[in-house]
Design a protein with these regions (language model features):
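Core catalytic lobe of class I
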Residues: 2-113
């Protein structure tokens, strides 16, 4: 069991195991996209991720994930039955500085619900 109002620095798949079934009203997550060679940017196993998300989300809860580029398709394809719609977040400043030398910086990100 996790303690409320406390920050945990741990693997999300391990941390979610401590969360009671159906107890979360909203999951808002900016997953690693797997677009860089950085260790922190490894794509999380979608099958394991969805297993935990579906277990902890309440009946009327929302799962909201940010995505961009080809990662958007990967997220939607990983669980099409739960995908409802997509919003476009238009940013006031372009981002994606990590890849600025390889590609244009983007001014939007997709929000998948």
């Amino acid at each position: 069991m996790i303690e409320l109002n406390k920050i945990y620095n741990e693997d999300c798949l391990e941390g979610m195991k401590k969360i009671p079934d159906g107890s979360i009203d909203m999951i808002l997550c900016d997953l690693p996209y797997g677009t860089t060679a950085s260790k922190w940017d490894s794509i999380i196993d979608f099958e394991k991720l969805w297993e935990e998300y579906e277990r902890i989300i309440s009946d009327n809860g929302a799962i909201v994930l940010t995505a961009s580029g080809s990662f958007t398709h990967k997220v939607i394809s990983s669980n099409e039955k739960l995908f409802r719609y997509k919003w476009i977040w238009i940013k006031s400043r372009p981002g994606n500085f990590v890849n600025a030398n390889n590609r244009p910086m983007t001014k939007y990100e997709e929000i998948l619900v």
